Amino acid sequence: GAAGVVDPKTGAIAYANEIMPGWSGVQLGPRLREDLGLPVAVVGDVQAHALGEAHWGVGKGKFSVLCLGIGTGIGGAYVENGRVMQGFHGAAGHMGHIECSAAAGIPCACGRSGHLESVASGTSIGRMYDERFGRVDPSRPSVGRDVNDLCRAGDEKATEVIYDAGFALGASLGSLANILDPEVIVLSGGVIHQGPDWRSQTWKDSVHEGYASQALDPLQDTPILIGSLEGDAPLIGAAEHLL
């Protein structure tokens, strides 16, 4: 699995934002085929992650799985009947770059503004805290883990930021569910698996409240699950894609 938008026909990196300078345009698939002398199939990293969870993780046995990977950025993928939806350009699943009202006017790493990733990724959680309350450590920008540690200690300001990020995430999940109607929703990635505090009651409540605010009535009970494979998911999913 590779970060960025992978050309489904060639395996080249068709697009990557400024978080990954120099990655866009890399002929990954062709170069690996040449260097290894073997057949190579390249899939997006979160698409691989979703395949892993859908086939061998918490989504095993489910007809359709909507998976979001939340870390430095936010990616996603949709698996139905065992197949990941890549889209014509390979860009399907870039759910961090859907419009989010809570992010209105906030620049996104992709060069646009108002995207979910700008308020719900680990990087954005740190930035939001700094903008509202000042840096946790004056010597450097805050990151999501800093805010999580404060929240764990009962800090009301940190709890507010994490709640707002969770609500924005949940509301976007509700909108996506209205389009895709998945059997289950799976959350995974670095932010989710940093520790149990990311799955605290405050965070769970905010995600579910955001989801309930947007999902249609028949979708209100769609399970929102935490991925079970953690860092192994994209490795397992990449193998599943090749097979």
Walk through the language-model features, giving the residues of each.
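A short, polar/charged loop-to-alpha-helix boundary motif
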Residues: 91-104
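A charged helix-plus-loop insertion that forms the helical arch/lid used to bind
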Residues: 11-24
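ATP-binding/phosphotransfer module of carbohydrate and carboxylate kinases, centering on a glycine-rich
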Residues: 6-12, 30-38, 55-62, 84, ...
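A short acidic Gly-Thr/Ser loop motif
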Residues: 69-73, 91, 190
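Conserved phosphate-binding catalytic cores of ATP/NTP-utilizing and phosphoryl-transfer enzymes
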Residues: 25, 29, 40-65
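Active-site glycine-centered loops adjacent to acidic/histidine catalytic or metal-binding residues
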Residues: 45, 71, 238
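Short beta-strand scaffold segments in enzyme catalytic cores
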Residues: 74-79
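Residue-level structural signal for beta-strand termini and adjacent loop
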Residues: 19, 90-91
